[in-house]
């Protein structure tokens, strides 16, 4: 699975999860506020975790406190809510945001390029400060930083849009600095001997993927008096009286860890740190991810349309000398059309889903960065909102301008294959080309992808339209009632290739009780009870298989003759005891949505139209195009299947199932792709562990294997 959202959340490794599972079966913890032996053991584990965290950041308990929090946002909010801004010199609340740093007492500042969790703190401190400043990161490089007192700067250590920022020691000497390290810790170890900020906020899942729901606030000990706890909760006091205002706060760390802490989550942190060590430490991870980012940028920059126009617009700061120290493992970009217009990021995300690529789109909860790199103004934000634009929605272009971007980010488990699949997706879906793209499957391994079932179809009557459902019961013959009926004329089987008149019919089975056949215009309808007493017919040979059948009777035959404008038509049904149905070669036909999309784009045909023409039972999403050709077996949840063969295609796919008209373009596109090989598309599969009462459902996870 090409996972390219490590800045959002990195992934735990298989070894890490196995170690955690073993730990959970052996570990028994208790409320650390109690005093029995299990509670004392819990206290010791928590204390050990604090020391392990400090060691990771190259500091000790002599210099920093460790306060456990729910996440980075929670840690930042603790600082903002409890910071001592001193006595204000102005009345009222701040009504305007300054674009420069202010001097004097009671100031709050943050970068333009900050996460919304940081920007939102301004409303926490609104009534406590004289000035709020939102500044460009270049301001901290200036020699003259205004002198302040009792002031807080929430400093973004690394933009989740682009790059890490450098901390100016002059800033630290004048302000209380709270570092938002959420994005930074995903690929870099913050060394607290090189920089000694007053506060550091981060989440552990950003470092090693698991556990979620637990973060930390590191507080420099000589800065601890700059925040003051004015309330208390369970486990936070030394003494309290419910009838008076008397209370005395316990030690610093527990004062801010209100209630019972996440002891099991804290115990799991050790396995995360061990995982980082197995990878060679964060320095090795940073080198690995920087190398991948460099290769990705090189590939993206090389993409051009036939007219020479660039396909990818990468957002960067040209004046910065790129290195592992100045560049995070993040690439933000948009895709550009041959006419210099933009592809919307929602369209890109949908194509990525087809290819199994997971990345981030939008503004990444960082509107300041979007404004800076996309040329959006404050007025445009308000205007866009009046047009319906909301955070997290699918409105990706307004007046032809992007409202967000595409972001890829790398982690310790990222590989070059992730980049290769992204390259294939861009080449297939967004590079203007006059010839079909032929992806190379040699470097890709299908068993590393995690696709899902997106569509299920059955065909009650062979060569008649499909029935789409989200759930189908399995039988030894395939989906229940799939190809259970067959139309014959003069004892010869009718198929769509030779008799496009069949496209006039649709069929569905209602509650396993009735077969409903309709003309396409729905002017005529035939209902056949599934319990109808049928007349046994001679066995029929269909695709070299001899199948016992029943005749559905004269009334049904007459209806078909009228609907198809033919004579001597009969509807046959597979005999109940038969282990075969009217499928051509195998109980199931599986196709890959990305392969469909690639052909659709080449001939400018609707994807749903092509899906209908290929008449599959199972459609999967989340694979690169045509990689399904390499599979030998697969599983859908706990259902196991073997690959019987590839499906060789004929001119039947040229028939428009809606009109019966023939158009050879799809077959020609497939021929061009196969390049003198058999024109196959999709794979035939057969279940190998069938048991009665099994079902397959849309949304189910699929695993492919090549052995």
Curated annotation (Swiss-Prot):
GO terms for molecular function: lyase activity; molybdenum cofactor sulfurtransferase activity; molybdenum ion binding; pyridoxal phosphate binding. It is an enzyme of class 2 (transferase). InterPro entries: Aminotrans_V_dom, MoCF_Sase_C, MoCo_sulfurase, MOCOS_middle, PyrdxlP-dep_Trfase, PyrdxlP-dep_Trfase_major, PyrdxlP-dep_Trfase_small, Pyrv_Knase-like_insert_dom_sf. Residues 558-705 form the MOSC domain. It comes from the Eukaryota. Its cofactor is pyridoxal 5'-phosphate. The modification N6-(pyridoxal phosphate)lysine is found at residue 206. Keywords: Molybdenum cofactor biosynthesis, Pyridoxal phosphate, Transferase. Disulfide bonds: none annotated. Pathway: Cofactor biosynthesis; molybdopterin biosynthesis. Pfam families: Aminotran_5 (PF00266), MOSC (PF03473), MOSC_N (PF03476). Gene3D superfamilies: Aspartate Aminotransferase, domain 1, Type I PLP-dependent aspartate aminotransferase-like (Major domain). It catalyses: Mo-molybdopterin + L-cysteine + AH2 = thio-Mo-molybdopterin + L-alanine + A + H2O. Transmembrane segments: none annotated. One of its GO terms (biological process) is Mo-molybdopterin cofactor biosynthetic process. Its EC number is 2.8.1.9. The active site is at residue 365. Sulfurates the molybdenum cofactor. Sulfation of molybdenum is essential for xanthine dehydrogenase (XDH) and aldehyde oxidase (ADO) enzymes in which molybdenum cofactor is liganded by 1 oxygen and 1 sulfur atom in active form. HAMAP family: MOCOS. Belongs to the class-V pyridoxal-phosphate-dependent aminotransferase family. MOCOS subfamily. PANTHER family: MITOCHONDRIAL AMIDOXIME REDUCING COMPONENT 1, MOLYBDOPTERIN COFACTOR SULFURASE MOSC. This is Molybdenum cofactor sulfurase. The lineage of its organism: Eukaryota, Metazoa, Ecdysozoa, Nematoda, Chromadorea.
